[in-house]
Amino acid sequence: MPMAPRVLLFCLLGLAVTEGHGLEAAVPIPGCHLHPFNVTVRSDRHGTCQGSHVAQACVGHCESSAFPSRYSVLVASGYRHNITSVSQCCTISSLKKVRVWLHCVGNQRGELEIFTARACQCDMCRLSRY
């Protein structure tokens, strides 16, 4: 192989590898992580007192899978449970209270405690009842 085509081939391979690393950086980090978000708290619908705070939420992706059920599961379910799925959800594993200072009409001040996430984990998915 002459020298010029060989150099061109290495340059193209280098470009392809470099481009691949750029794409990996755009993919979200796997797992379940704390994520900050702004919260505005009001004492009533009229906003007589209000304040803001950066609270923490749990955001991310956890593992899930589905596969054909074992024969024993098929028999036990009367051949109705033919797919077994396993999944976990990103959840708050511990909370903490934080104090939010409220600014009120007439230069008054107040305070209110709210909950924020302290730690996150991938755990069993549960139905929410809010």
Curated annotation (Swiss-Prot):
Which UniProt keywords are present, listed alphabetically? Disulfide bond, Glycoprotein, Hormone, Secreted, Signal
Q: Where in the cell is it found?
A: Secreted
Q: Glycosylation annotated at which residues?
A: N38, N82
Please report any disulfide bonds recorded for this protein chain, giving both cysteine positions.
C32-C90, C49-C104, C58-C120, C62-C122
Q: What is its main location?
A: secreted
Hydrolase is among the record's keywords = no
Listed GO MF terms? hormone activity; protein heterodimerization activity; thyrotropin-releasing hormone receptor binding
Signal sequence extent: 1-22
GO CC, one annotated term: extracellular space
User: Which InterPro entries does the record match to this protein?
Assistant: Cys_knot_C, Cystine-knot_cytokine, Glyco_hormone, Glyco_Hormone_Alpha
GO BP, sorted A to Z: adenylate cyclase-activating G protein-coupled receptor signaling pathway; cell surface receptor signaling pathway
Quaternary structure, per UniProt, is:
Heterodimer with GPHB5; this heterodimer interacts with thyroid-stimulating hormone receptor (TSHR), and hence stimulates cAMP production.
Q: Which family does the record assign?
A: Belongs to the glycoprotein hormones subunit alpha family.
Protein function: Functions as a heterodimeric glycoprotein hormone with GPHB5 able to bind and activate the thyroid-stimulating hormone receptor (TSHR), leading to increased cAMP production. Plays a central role in controlling thyroid cell metabolism.
What PANTHER family does the record tag this protein with? GLYCOPROTEIN HORMONE ALPHA-2
Q: What is this protein called?
A: Glycoprotein hormone alpha-2
Could you tell me which species this protein originates from?
A: Rattus norvegicus
The gene it comes from is: Gpha2
